[in-house]
């Protein structure tokens, strides 16, 4: 269970689950991961792609350490949530999860199936995800549950909340305004992390 406290927000327990695994969003939580001794694995990603565009070996050491730790615990949901070496509430991941739950309701209604449990879960998600909006910085942030720390990285994934449609026009307007400014001084549109 990735949401044992029923907050409506699920955790990712490995950066690979996010879909943007070598993002600087994960640098701080990953730096806290102690690499297991005598770790062994073989990389192929840096053989077919320019190694400068791939994570460093120390990053991969941490990825594999987390993966091995999850495997040792047999992926037991009760164990891994509490003891995972990496446990982050990711706004991008939760935005996609929220949107998928909303889409699921449409399907359930189409087939005249009960959607009350999911509707209640969505209400909880929409309420609690707003706790991750920083009014001063005017953006959402991820939260490192393991180390109890906010992750303030200006990631393009923070805008996925617009896709989830939380029906908060004030926040939506702020995000749209910020999104329009995201590329003003950049060579490429919508870089995953906004340069300073």
Each model region followed by its residue ranges:
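Short, contiguous, pocket-lining structural segments
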Residues: 85-99, 117, 121, 153
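Extended, well-ordered alpha-helical scaffold segments
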Residues: 1, 100, 104, 111-129, ...
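Well-ordered alpha-helical scaffold segments within catalytic/enzyme domains
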Residues: 95-113, 160-170, 196
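Extended glycan-interaction surfaces of carbohydrate-active proteins
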Residues: 7-88, 126-196
